[in-house]
UniProtKB/Swiss-Prot annotation:
The J domain is necessary and sufficient to stimulate DnaK ATPase activity. Zinc center 1 plays an important role in the autonomous, DnaK-independent chaperone activity of DnaJ. Zinc center 2 is essential for interaction with DnaK and for DnaJ activity. CXXCXGXG motif repeats lie at residues 151-158, 168-175, 190-197, 204-211. The lineage of its organism: Bacteria, Pseudomonadati, Pseudomonadota, Alphaproteobacteria, Hyphomonadales. Zn(2+) 2 binds at residues 168, 171, 190, 193. This is Chaperone protein DnaJ. It comes from Hyphomonas neptunium (strain ATCC 15444). A zinc finger (CR-type) spans 138-216. Residues 5-70 form the J domain. The gene is dnaJ.
């Protein structure tokens, strides 16, 4: 079967530069890497194909020969005896590892060679809900976190007490094995030890051979005053234990402040809506506004106050967790409450007020009526819509 054009394999033009060539190869190699497509022979063939194409086109001498003679440059012993890797001992996996180690460091890709030595433990997440009042004052919270700890009976080895894990004979303790396929050498996770490099003949009954068990730990967490939803608190070294003597991971506590019945929050500022009796709004007066600290603030209402008017109470908001010593404000939006369930006398008094009130008492209404008249083209009924 004839081979595809190497440029076509990598999806690049013939004049592609080295940077774009490397980028195209990296994308395809990640897509078709055997460790990402276990058991998929088609993906494995693709991985070999892109590796072969990159081996030629990334070498200036071989690329020049390919551009001039095509695949014939590497047949009948030319340019390395028929192997596109030119007798240098290279293979698609080695090219892939060399390229990705430049980007991620040794072992940085999931399909890379097994990392040896101490490994840091995994980080943990804990979601914590608190009230707005708790966020205002801050608090010391006790949390219970389930996490993996080293199994005490086997001391974290996973082997039954009195026994030890044995080095895997198949991979020699490396966790990965190599298989020769023509001129390719493929590296895979060892199927005997599952990449651990060790075999446990007699597993520990307590942990089932895992070397770790789940326990619930009680921790004290200090929640700072002014904390907001979405903020996280880091407890260093309170995550999962490391392996082979590696350090513990960290515990991240994600805070969620639940909605409040009265106040809405925007950073350090608080907002609320306060009902104002119609008479107070008309004559002026005072109303009491609840504050987040559990107290009350007396607010002066000016004569003729209207719905939607906002009042600002300085330093009655939330403490700022980002700026020590600073406190936000409380913004109060008024809405005039229309009286309901009136008695006959109350209705009569309102009618008397209506009879003696003029345009000066309702400037907004008069202004609105004037706009309507101008919209209709005057006061005449002949131009009004039916």
């Amino acid at each position: 079967m004839s081979k595809r054009d190497y440029y076509e394999v990598l999806g690049v033009e013939r004049g592609v530069d080295e940077k774009a060539l490397k980028s195209a190869y990296r994308k395809l190699a990640m897509k078709y890497h055997p460790d990402q497509n276990a058991g998929d022979t088609a993906a494995e063939d693709k991985f070999k194909e892109v590796g072969e194409a990159y081996a030629i086109l990334s070498d200036p001498q071989k690329r020049a020969a390919y551009d001039r003679y095509g695949h014939g440059a590497f047949e009948n012993g030319g340019m390395g005896g028929g192997s596109p890797f030119g007798g240098q001992g290279g293979n698609p996996e080695d090219i892939f590892q060399d390229l990705f180690s430049q980007v991620f460091g040794a072992g940085g890709f999931a399909g890379g060679r097994r990392r040896s030595g101490p490994q840091r433990g995994a980080d943990l997440r804990y979601d914590l809900e608190i009230t707005l009042e708790e966020a205002f004052y801050g608090k010391d919270e006790t949390i219970h976190v389930p996490q993996a700890v080293a199994c005490r009976p086997c001391e974290g080895t996973g082997a039954a007490p009195g026994t030890k894990p044995e080095t895997c004979e198949t991979c020699g303790g490396h966790g990965r094995v190599r298989a020769q396929q023509g001129f390719f050498t493929m590296e895979r996770t060892c199927h005997i030890c599952q990449g651990r490099g060790q075999i446990i003949r007699k597993p520990c009954k307590t942990c089932g051979g895992h070397g770790q068990v789940k326990e619930e730990r009680k921790l004290q967490v200090k929640i700072p005053a002014g904390v907001e939803s979405g903020m996280r608190i880091r407890l260093s070294g309170e995550g999962e234990p490391g392996t082979s003597g590696g350090p513990k991971g960290d515990l991240y506590i994600f805070v969620e402040v639940v909605e409040h019945d009265i106040f809405e929050r925007d950073g350090p500022n608080l907002y609320c809506r306060a009902p104002v009796p119609m008479t107070t709004a008309a004559l002026g007066g005072e109303i009491d506004i609840p504050t987040i600290d559990g107290g009350r603030a007396r607010v002066a209402i000016p004569e003729g106050a209207q719905t939607g008017r906002k009042l600002r109470l300085r330093s009655k908001g939330m403490p700022s967790v980002r700026a020590n010593g600073q406190t936000g404000d409380l913004y109060v939006e008024m809405f005039v409450e229309t009286p309901q369930n009136l008695t006959a006398r109350q209705k009569d008094l309102l009618r008397q007020f209506c009879d003696c009130s003029g345009a000066d008492c309702h400037p907004e209404s008069e202004g609105f009526l004037g706009k309507i008249k101008r919209f209709w083209g005057g006061e005449g009924d002949e131009k009004r819509p039916v």
